[in-house]
């Protein structure tokens, strides 16, 4: 079963809910870093947050990145995964993909369902 890390802004609950459902339907295992919820208490926990995220990315086969709005953490997670040879697929929500997004992503998809299909493969 393909493990897929959900990269996205911390408050993107709807993205995480929809992506989780679509990934399950596609036979993938979503890995949501927000289950380790650090919202409102990041100060002093930066190392734990980042190292936890990196370890989870390393444990996955792919990253589904929500690039519907700018987010520093999402960009760093996608860049890290790309550098490790882990497949990255970007969900843009119809927003123009930034050149860096195009560079690191195997596919940039306007629709979340299309992004999941690109990850799940044949």
What residue spans do the PLM features occupy?
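Conserved catalytic or regulatory cores that recognize and/or transform ribose-phosphate-containing ligands
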Residues: 1-122
